[in-house]
Structure formats: structure tokens, C-alpha cells
UniProtKB/Swiss-Prot annotation:
Note: The variability of the residues taking part of IgE-binding epitopes might be responsible of the difference in cross-reactivity among olive pollen cultivars, and between distantly related pollen species, leading to a variable range of allergy reactions among atopic patients.
A GO MF label: actin monomer binding
Keyword Cytoplasm: yes
Protein name as it appears in the record: Profilin-1
Cystine connections: 13-118
Annotated Pfam families: Profilin
Modifications the protein undergoes after translation, according to the UniProt entry: Phosphorylated by MAP kinases.
Function field: Binds to actin and affects the structure of the cytoskeleton. At high concentrations, profilin prevents the polymerization of actin, whereas it enhances it at low concentrations.
Residues with Phosphothreonine modification: 114
Organism: Olea europaea
Family recorded in the similarity comment: Belongs to the profilin family.
Localisation: Cytoplasm, Cytoskeleton
GO cellular component: cell cortex; cytoskeleton
Amino acid sequence: MSWQAYVDDHLMCDIEGPEDHRLTAAAIVGHDGSVWAQSATFPQFKPEEMNGIMTDFNEPGHLAPTGLHLGGTKYMVIQGEAGAVVRGKKGSGGITIKKTGQALVFGIYEEPVTPGQCNMVVERLGDYLLEQGL
């Protein structure tokens, strides 16, 4: 399966619930900042933004004072899982990032998608990739 298929079929898919909803944007990005696959709506990011995110995985709390920046959008960092998941909130939407052995799995959402739905979609794929040694 291509990396693009993982984004299209497992991240940008309909989310089960009272109504079917989808993430706003999603991507799989290598630890070095190279994009493996992304939705057409995923923001163009700067290398320093990706460096900050990687630093937060290695040094949990690094982004808390400044916020998480991606594509020029600032998210307030909220409770995640140290070294494994970073979560951010901005208005009625937010972001979930799951770290695997070689990549970061990104999901960006807006209402009516809930933070829990975004977490579920992103972390499910991230856990699968970890099980595959990726």
C-alpha cells in the first residue's frame, strides 16, 4: 500500500458517529521533515516548525510556552502522551500528532469533528505503523 493510500483511506476517511465527518487535513511526515504523503489540504510547513515538533517528542513540554506552529497556524498545546502523542487546540479545531519509529502521523480537524475522533483516527494508524516496525 502506498503512503498516499494510508492518508486517503485511513486518515481522510469518514469517521463513524451520529453523522459521518472527516478530518480537515492529514499527513505522514518522516522524522527528518520529508513528506511521505499528505492530503491536498495539509498546510505547507517550515523546517523549523517540524524541528520544534520533533523536539517536543524528545523533550516533552518544549512547545508548551510558545505553542505548536504548523503552516503558520499556532495551536495551544494540550494534554498529550509524553514522547508519543502531541495534541493542540485552536478555536473549534485542533491537531493530533502521533510519533512512530520513523514518522509522524498528523491529523487536523474542525468542528463538528471532535478531539476524541481525531485522536482515534490518528492514533489508530500510528499504532498500526508501530506494529509494522515503522
